[in-house]
From Swiss-Prot:
The phosphoenolpyruvate-dependent sugar phosphotransferase system (sugar PTS), a major carbohydrate active transport system, catalyzes the phosphorylation of incoming sugar substrates concomitantly with their translocation across the cell membrane. The enzyme II ChbABC PTS system is involved in the transport of the chitin disaccharide N,N'-diacetylchitobiose (GlcNAc2). Also able to use N,N',N''-triacetyl chitotriose (GlcNAc3). Keywords: Cytoplasm, Phosphoprotein, Phosphotransferase system, Sugar transport, Transferase, Transport. The PTS EIIA type-3 domain is phosphorylated by phospho-HPr on a histidyl residue. Then, it transfers the phosphoryl group to the PTS EIIB type-3 domain. Residues 15-113 form the PTS EIIA type-3 domain. Pfam families: PTS_IIA. This is PTS system N,N'-diacetylchitobiose-specific EIIA component. The active site is at residue 89. Induction: By GlcNAc2, GlcNAc3 and beta-N,N'-diacetylchitobiose (Me-TCB). It comes from Escherichia coli (strain K12).
Amino acid sequence: MMDLDNIPDTQTEAEELEEVVMGLIINSGQARSLAYAALKQAKQGDFAAAKAMMDQSRMALNEAHLVQTKLIEGDAGEGKMKVSLVLVHAQDHLMTSMLARELITELIELHEKLKA
């Protein structure tokens, strides 16, 4: 992983940052996809599978959040990092995935209560 304490000045470092940001998008998307798959399992009454998928979703989201935290720490609120459209897209993916997981957790609990 690139050194996020030194925000890129060269094309190679910019490419490394883009790779890190793409990882953020991929992990966020994975977290959201797994959460929706868990909801599908809950609708079918398979709460063990739903829980396992939500656990996997949490791990993917934790990976994404770790990258986000390092990016924020690297910038330290000083505007060192150039904000690209891809970075904004990655942040959007992360936030929508976090929201989806929170809502899906509630929906799974409701399905569980309804099936009891």
